Regions:
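Non-cytosolic membrane-interface motifs at loop->transmembrane helix junctions
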Residues: 151-162
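A juxtamembrane structural motif centered on a specific transmembrane helix
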Residues: 172-187
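Transmembrane alpha-helical segments in integral membrane proteins
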Residues: 98-119
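Hydrophobic cores of alpha-helical transmembrane segments in multi-pass inner/ER membrane proteins
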Residues: 106, 166-176
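Transmembrane alpha-helical segments of integral membrane proteins
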Residues: 138-149
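N-terminal signal-anchor transmembrane alpha helix
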Residues: 3-46
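Individual transmembrane alpha-helix segments
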Residues: 60-103
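Internal alpha-helical transmembrane segments of multi-pass membrane proteins
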Residues: 3-4, 116-135, 184-185
């Protein structure tokens, strides 16, 4: 159990660090299209005016909830707007701490699964198992967005690469820290 907990903390830290490289540095700009400063300010004002009263949420624009909305969706342009009503600090320390805690919990769940199903497997086999599950899950959840919901391929491909590499780093750590078949009884 101590190795599982230590591996989860260190694996979560590895996952968080990879995520930070992708999303907390200028590298993250690869995921986004840029608009001119004047257009950005005008869009922000329009968001505040039209979405501010209804609050934080995800908005499909135009809304396909009516016949007229469905016709507008068919004509385009369309957007899925992830709207936050309040300002945020960049970097947001609260989000960084919350993200680290989430990463540790996710690696703990993966470690429990590995320990339950692959306790007698070698490090290489456990690592392969994590990579295969990470690839399958992130392919569906990340790249499923452009496939099913017509979201932008560039952003979600970048997200997929960051998620897959985060899980690869975390998987290597947790697979290493779980007791090896040769060391059973020494935990």
């Amino acid at each position: 159990m101590p190795r599982l907990l230590i591996g989860s903390v260190l694996g979560g830290l590895a996952m968080w660090l990879v995520g930070f490289v992708f999303w907390g540095t200028p590298l993250s700009l690869l995921a986004y299209k840029q608009v001119a400063a004047g257009d950005s300010a005008a869009l922000q004002a329009a968001l505040a005016q039209h979405l501010g009263p209804t609050g934080t949420g995800a908005y499909w624009i135009p809304s396909p909830g009516s016949a007229a909305g469905t016709e507008l969706v068919g004509r385009g342009p369309n957007a899925l707007v992830q709207f936050v009503n309040s300002g945020i600090a960049l970097p947001d320390t609260g989000a960084l701490i919350g993200g680290l805690i989430l990463a540790i919990l996710c690696v703990l769940v993966a470690g429990i699964a590995l320990r339950s199903c692959a306790a007698r497997a070698s490090f290489a086999d456990r690592f392969k198992l994590v990579l295969l599950f990470a690839a399958a899950i992130t392919l569906y959840t990340d790249l499923g967005q452009p496939v099913f919901n017509h979201m932008p391929w560039g952003y979600f491909t970048y997200l997929w690469v960051s998620d897959l590499l985060s899980w690869a780093a975390a998987g290597a750590v947790i697979a290493w820290f779980l007791p090896h078949p040769r060391s059973e009884g020494r935990e």
